[in-house]
C-alpha cells in the first residue's frame, strides 16, 4: 500500500481507471491528505466558539469583527487572517509528515463578488494560485472544493448562506453564477496537473432540503457539462446529500472521469460502515474518496483510515488546523482572555475596541504554523506510522479467523474472529446507536489457538519497539512474524493482563506483522508500533469540547 500513498506517486494528471485513481504514470494512487477548513470559509466551532453560536459563518464573522474593532481594523483583518492561516510553512510540514494531497474548501465570496452582476475577485484567485504553487513545489495534489456555492447549497451554516436556505437550488441567478464560477476555475486550472480534481459541491442538501435532490442531480449534469466544455482532463468529485452520507443522488454515472465522495464521522471503524459505498463503486465502476472525516480519538483515526485505504479508498482528514482543539493535527492556541470574545458572541459584555484588537492580533499571531501546537499522536494515527497504538480489533482487511461467530454489535462480523467486550466494560447504559460513536473501543479481539491476525503500519524506523497489550485466563503463547521470519514470541501466564515489550522492529516503509496464537487463547487489546499508549482524550462527547 505504501507505494500508492507515497508522495513519490505524485506525478502527472490524476485520472479514473475503473474503480481506481491512477497518476500520470498509470500507477494506482490513493489520496491521503488534509483539508484547510476554516481558511476560506470560517466556522464558529473552529474558532472555539462552541456549537450553536450565532457567529458560525463568514458573513457573521465579518460583522463580528466590525462590531468589536471598527471598520478600519476589520478591513485589514481578513487579509492577515488568510495570510497567516495557510503559509508555505504549513505546506512544507504537511508534505514532510508524508501526506500526499490537500483539499481546499472555497467560499464563492472569496472568488466572486456578492453582487447581482458576475464579477470575479482577482485577489482571491491570487491567494488560491499561491497555495497551489506551494503545493506543486512540495509534491502535494490539490482538490478544489466548492464549500460555499453562490446562495448556499446545504441548508445549514457551513456554506455561508444568509438564512440556512439552499438558494443554489431555488434562485436561478445563484445557479447560473455557480456554473460560471466552475467554468472560470476550469479555465484557470485546466493545464495544472497538480490540481487533482474538482469537488463540485460540499455536503449538499441536509434534512428537509433533500426535497431538492432532483435539482441537485440536474446541477451535477449542468456543472459537468460546463466544465467539460473547457477541461476534459481533471477528475470531477461528486458528493451525496445529508453531509455526503446519503447516496440517493447516485442514480447514474455523472461522468466517466468522476469519483464518488462520501464523508464519515461517528461511524464504527469496520467494513460494514463502508459497504453501501463499496456497492455503489462496484455498480458504477468508479473509485471512492473519503473526502472528509475526523473528530474522534486517535485510535478511531488509525482504525478507520487504514481500513479505508486497504479497501482502496482515499482519505482526507478534517481539518488541518483549528483553534484550541484537542485532536487536530495542528491547533492554534486561543489567546489568554479569548473567553472575553466568546462571551460577547453569547450576549456578554463588549470587551472594548482596544482589548478586542489586542486579542485578535494575538489570535492571528498564534495561527502561524510555528506558533501552533502539533499533535504527533494524531498525525501518527491518521498516517498509521510509528509511534502508533493500533486497537486489536483494527486488524488488516483480509485477515481471517477460524472460530468467530457474529457479535451483537455488527462489528466485522464477516472476519471470522470472535469479538467481545473487554472485561469490566458494560454498554447497557448506551442507546444502541451510540455504540459506534463513543464506545466501540470497549470491544476486543479474541485470538484462539491456531488463529493468526495481521497488522500493518508505515514508516518504521530501525529499532522501533513493539508492545503487545493482551490478557488471558488460562495462559497463552504468541508468535510474531514479519513475512515468514519469526521476530519474537510472547508467553502469557494464567490470569495475565499486561502491556509487554516484545521486540524491536526492523526499518520499513511498510511493515505487516502476523500474530499467531500457538497455545491457548487471549484477548488482544492493542498492538503498539513504538511506545504509544492509549490516548487520554476521553469519550467522543468529551472530545467535542474545545480545550
Language-model regions, residue ranges each:
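Extended, alpha-helix-rich binding/interface surfaces that flank or overlap catalytic cores
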Residues: 314, 321-389
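Glycine-rich, proline-tolerant flexible connector loops at the mouths of alpha/beta enzymes
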Residues: 108-119
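Short, solvent-exposed loop/turn elements at domain surfaces
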Residues: 30, 39-46, 269-270, 325-326, ...
